[in-house]
């Protein structure tokens, strides 16, 4: 645990990215400890009796003493130091977890500050610097926290504390405040996925228990995402924060507040632009769909936002966008579908025409979705003209036989939906193609005449043929 900064952090804004300026190239390590303060000598803890071995009347005082003992931090990077005391603290933490789970009347008003102090001493620390240019979260193994044998039990204890039937938010709010939440959110940048998973549960419990902190938590998550999108593109806990948001959005009251709608359009939609989208796309798509199920009128700005940020050069991201778009179409209201069908299917037509077969294949799979097919059938007079030329051309020219087979199935479906328009479009397409071929032939003949004329002029100029 690092020493406190000279200037206390503002509670108006969380900075989960302050470490970026001090990130340096480093050798990859499998473990790191970010909380040890050098003691200079071996640590000695006075062994205390087990809680179950003392009379019930003495247990509250002993509980407080054990909480105070567990504030001592050990160096886990030195695997040979303080082995006995490390094991003693581990067993004490285990005992505290069991005690708070099964005992009744253990959460007196005096225990709240000691619990929060013990948790704070153990989990709040400066995270080890990470060079985002060298570390690829999709390829590299994360840096695991060496002190996890203790840290895990501290998190487990804190969760049991928050979930206890005796827990009183009215007392706890004196100690679990905005400053505590800020420090908790900074820890979401931990590279250790085990820690982020526990943090997710802790923050979710705090959001549920402390009504007065809810708006503040949403605001700080908003700040983290904005910094992530527009400045750093580095934050390890985006997926976990989005998972929490999915539950929060699900609980929003109707009608939605303007701030919630703004968060969707100004924060969640731009999250699609970052390079590491694949790490949290499933959670992001879930949040988007939750918003649309709450308020279908948001469908149009969401679809237009996705069209605006549609990937131009990354086929993998295109496939993800298409998957998310299908999730949206699964819950779209027919009245909303009509508003966005033209720009939507112009984009789908481009995807179907993609030389990358996975993009084309994912777009063509829309026609296997019964609900989407029903929407297409109801609006075939608009959608068929948009899609037809791309589909017909692909059926003749695409390099991948699997794509050609899928296109034939789509064309067959369109023909069954609206045979009259299909025949008209076929005739028009063939007529246009013949005109294009005729123009192309005329263009070639014109160029040939011009080349011949230029050749003759050159020969006359050189006196090879008489003028």
From Swiss-Prot:
Alphabetized UniProt keyword annotations: Acetylation, Cytoplasm, Phosphoprotein
InterPro entries the UniProt entry points to: ARM-like, ARM-type_fold, PP2A_B56
One Pfam family here: B56
Biased composition (Low complexity): 30-39
Modification N-acetylserine, positions: 2
Keyword Phosphoprotein part of the UniProt annotation: yes
Main location: cytoplasm
Composition bias, Basic residues: 20-29
GO cellular component: cytoplasm; cytosol; protein phosphatase type 2A complex
Example GO BP: signal transduction
Region Disordered: start-end pairs: 1-39
GO MF: protein phosphatase regulator activity
Coiled coil start-end: none
Phosphothreonine, modified sites: 7
List of residues that carry Phosphoserine: 30, 32, 34
Subcellular location: Cytoplasm
Signal peptide extent: none
Purpose of the protein: The B regulatory subunit might modulate substrate selectivity and catalytic activity, and might also direct the localization of the catalytic enzyme to a particular subcellular compartment. Interacts with cyclin G in vitro.
Subunit structure: PP2A consists of a common heterodimeric core enzyme, composed of a 36 kDa catalytic subunit (subunit C) and a 65 kDa constant regulatory subunit (PR65 or subunit A), that associates with a variety of regulatory subunits. Proteins that associate with the core dimer include three families of regulatory subunits B (the R2/B/PR55/B55, R3/B''/PR72/PR130/PR59 and R5/B'/B56 families), the 48 kDa variable regulatory subunit, viral proteins, and cell signaling molecules. Interacts with SGO1. Found in a complex with at least ARL2, PPP2CB; PPP2R1A, PPP2R2A, PPP2R5E and TBCD.
PANTHER family attached to this UniProt entry: SERINE/THREONINE PROTEIN PHOSPHATASE 2A PP2A REGULATORY SUBUNIT B, SERINE_THREONINE-PROTEIN PHOSPHATASE 2A 56 KDA REGULATORY SUBUNIT EPSILON ISOFORM
Family: Belongs to the phosphatase 2A regulatory subunit B56 family.
Record-given protein name: Serine/threonine-protein phosphatase 2A 56 kDa regulatory subunit epsilon isoform
Lineage, opening ranks: Eukaryota, Metazoa, Chordata, Craniata, Vertebrata
């Amino acid at each position: 645990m690092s020493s406190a900064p000279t200037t206390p952090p503002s509670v108006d804004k969380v900075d989960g990215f302050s470490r970026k300026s001090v990130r340096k190239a480093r050798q990859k390590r499998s473990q790191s400890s970010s909380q040890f303060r050098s003691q200079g000598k071996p640590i000695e803890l006075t062994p205390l009796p087990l809680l179950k071995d003392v009379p019930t009347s003495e247990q509250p005082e002993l509980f407080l003493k054990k909480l105070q003992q567990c504030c001592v931090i050990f160096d886990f990077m030195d695997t040979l130091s303080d082995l006995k005391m490390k094991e003693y603290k581990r067993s004490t933490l285990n005992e505290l977890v069991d005690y708070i789970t099964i005992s009744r009347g253990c959460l007196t008003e005096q225990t709240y500050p000691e619990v929060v102090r013990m948790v704070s001493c153990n989990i709040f620390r400066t995270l080890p610097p990470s060079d985002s240019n060298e570390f690829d979260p999709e390829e590299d193994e994360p840096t695991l926290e060496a002190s996890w044998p203790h840290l895990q039990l501290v998190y487990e204890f804190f969760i049991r504390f928050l979930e206890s039937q005796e827990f009183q938010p009215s007392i706890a709010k004196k100690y679990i405040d905005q400053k505590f939440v800020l420090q908790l959110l900074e820890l979401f940048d931990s590279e250790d996925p085990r820690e982020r998973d526990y943090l997710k549960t802790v923050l979710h419990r705090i959001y549920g228990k402390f009504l007065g902190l809810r708006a503040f938590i949403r605001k700080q998550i908003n700040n983290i995402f904005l910094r992530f999108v527009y400045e750093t593109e580095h934050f390890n806990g985006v997926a976990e924060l989005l998972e929490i948001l999915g539950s929060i959005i699900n609980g929003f009251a109707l009608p939605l507040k303007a701030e919630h709608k703004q968060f969707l359009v100004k924060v969640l939609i731009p999250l699609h632009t970052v390079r590491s989208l694949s790490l949290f796309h499933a959670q992001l798509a879930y949040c988007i769909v939750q918003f649309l199920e709450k308020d279908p009128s948001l469908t149009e700005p969401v679809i237009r936002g996705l069209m605006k940020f549609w990937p131009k050069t990354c086929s993998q991201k295109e496939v993800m966008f298409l998957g998310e778009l299908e999730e949206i179409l699964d819950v779209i209201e027919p009245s909303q579908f009509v508003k966005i069908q033209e720009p939507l299917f112009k984009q789908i037509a481009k995807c179907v025409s993609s030389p990358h077969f996975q993009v084309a294949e994912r777009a063509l799979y829309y026609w296997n979705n019964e609900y989407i097919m029903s929407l297409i059938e109801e609006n075939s007079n608009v959608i068929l003209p948009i899609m037809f030329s791309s589909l017909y051309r692909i059926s003749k020219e695409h390099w991948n036989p699997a794509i050609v087979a899928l296109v034939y199935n789509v064309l067959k479906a369109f023909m069954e939906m609206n045979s009259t328009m299909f025949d008209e479009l076929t005739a028009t397409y063939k007529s246009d193609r013949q005109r294009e071929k005729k123009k192309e032939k005329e263009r070639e003949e014109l160029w040939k005449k011009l080349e011949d004329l230029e050749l003759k002029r050159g020969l006359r100029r050189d006196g090879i043929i008489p003028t």
